[in-house]
Amino acid sequence: MVKYISILGSTGSIGTSALDVVSAHPEHFKIVGLTANYNIDLLEQQIKTFQPRIVSVATKDLADKLRTRISANTKITHGTDGFIAVATHPDSNLVLSSVVGVSGLLPTIEALKAKKDIAIANKETLVAAGHIVTELAKQNGCRLIPVDSEHSAIFQCLKGENNKEIEKLIVTASGGAFRDKTRDEMQTLQAKDALKHPNWLMGAKLTIDSATLMNKGFEVMEARWLFDIPYKKINVMIHKESIIHSLVEFIDGSVMAQLGAPDMRMPIQYAFHYPTRLPSSYEKLNLLEIGSLHFEKPDLEKFPCLQYAYECGKIGGTTPAVLNAANEIANALFLKNEIAFFDIEKTIYKTVEAHHNVKDPSLDAILEADQWARQYANELLIKKR
C-alpha cells in the first residue's frame, strides 16, 4: 500500500531525513504536502523533486516570492492556516509532525480531527497538550506513531506485548555536548560549544535541549502520553554510544532493547511503513566494531532541567506548557549568545514557580499559559541583556 505523506517541517533535520526515506522507496511513499518557515531555497528544490500538491511557508511575502520561482502545479499557502491546510489535505493519509516547538500543536490537532495518522517527531505537542492529543487520536481512530529514536525503540519493543506487564521504560540519553564537563566549566560555555553533539546530527534548538538534558525530560513526558505509563515507571539512563535507543523491562525481569546505528532515517522509515518493515541501505550495526557499551545514571544536580521535566509532568495541567514555553524563549536567546548557559535553567525554574496551574486545561487554556510564559520569561531575560 502506498502511503501519501504530508511533512510539517520539511527543511529541518527530521524533514530532510524523511525525504531521503521517500526518495529511497518511491514505490511506497508519495509526498502530498510540505511546510517550511523561512528556508524557501531548500523548499523550492524539494518542490521540484517531489511535486507536492500543496506547500506552506511562514509569511505571505515568502509565499509570493516562492510563486515566482515555481512552475509546478503546487498550491502555495502561508501562516498557521497554511500549515493546517497541509496537515489536513484530503489526499494524505499520514502526517509527519517534525516542526520545532509548540507551533506544531494546532496543525497536529487539526490533522487528527481530519482522521490522519500522525508520525510524531514534535515533542512539544505532547509535552504541552498530551491529554488532548491522545484523546483526539482515540476518538478519531488515528495512530500516533513515534519517530524519535527513543520512543520508536520502545514502540518496537512493545509490539505484541501487554502494557500491563511493563515494569518500567528506560529511555537512553547520550548525555549531550556537555556530558563530560563540570558545572564550573559549563558556566562559560557558549552556543557554539553546545552545538557539537557527540552522536546525532540535529537542529540547533534540539541540540541545545540535549546539552541541558531538557530534551530528555521532554522525551520522558512524551513517553508518558504515548505509552500511557506513569512517571514513576519511566527512567533515564546515560548511554554515551547511542546504540541502544531505549529499553523495556517487564514484570518477570525480562528486558527488551532496540539497537541500531544513530541514524534518524531508520525510525522514520519504520514509522512511515508501519506495521511492516522495508529494506534499507543505511549503515548497519556492527557490535564487534563497537566492542563495549557503557551506562550511568544522569546527574540531576548537574542537569536540573531533567528533574524539572519530571516534576512539571507530575503536576500536569498547564505547567508542562509553561515549562516548554520558558525553555523555548531561553534556548533561542542562548543560541544568539544573549544569555549564559545557566540562564536557561534559571529562567525555566522562575517561570514555572510564578505560574498558577490550571488542572485539566482546555486547548485555549494551554495556549494562554504558553503565551503568558513566553512573556514572563522574556521579561526575566531582558534584565540579563
UniProtKB/Swiss-Prot annotation:
Amino-acid positions noted as binding NADPH in the UniProt annotation, renumbered to this chain: 11-14, 39, 122, 124, 203
Cofactor requirement: Mg(2+); Mn(2+)
Binding sites annotated in the UniProt record for 1-deoxy-D-xylulose 5-phosphate: 123, 149-150, 174, 197, 210, 215-216, 219
Pathway: Isoprenoid biosynthesis; isopentenyl diphosphate biosynthesis via DXP pathway; isopentenyl diphosphate from 1-deoxy-D-xylulose 5-phosphate: step 1/6
InterPro entries (UniProt xref): DXP_reductoisomerase, DXP_reductoisomerase_C, DXP_reductoisomerase_N, DXPR_C, DXPR_C_sf, NAD(P)-bd_dom_sf
Enzyme Commission number: 1.1.1.267
Reactions this protein catalyses: 2-C-methyl-D-erythritol 4-phosphate + NADP(+) = 1-deoxy-D-xylulose 5-phosphate + NADPH + H(+)
Pfam families: DXP_redisom_C (PF08436), DXP_reductoisom (PF02670), DXPR_C (PF13288)
Lineage: superkingdom: Bacteria
GO molecular function: 1-deoxy-D-xylulose-5-phosphate reductoisomerase activity; manganese ion binding; NADPH binding
Residue stretches spanning the membrane: none
Keywords assigned by UniProt, alphabetized: Isoprene biosynthesis, Manganese, Metal-binding, NADP, Oxidoreductase
Gene Ontology BP, a term: isopentenyl diphosphate biosynthetic process, methylerythritol 4-phosphate pathway involved in terpenoid biosynthetic process
Record-listed Mn(2+) binding positions: 148, 150, 219
PANTHER family listed in its UniProt record: 1-DEOXY-D-XYLULOSE 5-PHOSPHATE REDUCTOISOMERASE (PTHR30525), 1-DEOXY-D-XYLULOSE 5-PHOSPHATE REDUCTOISOMERASE, CHLOROPLASTIC (PTHR30525:SF0)
Family (UniProt): Belongs to the DXR family.
NCBIfam families reported for this sequence: Dxr, PRK12464.1
Task of the protein: Catalyzes the NADPH-dependent rearrangement and reduction of 1-deoxy-D-xylulose-5-phosphate (DXP) to 2-C-methyl-D-erythritol 4-phosphate (MEP).
Protein name: 1-deoxy-D-xylulose 5-phosphate reductoisomerase 1
Gene of this entry: dxr1
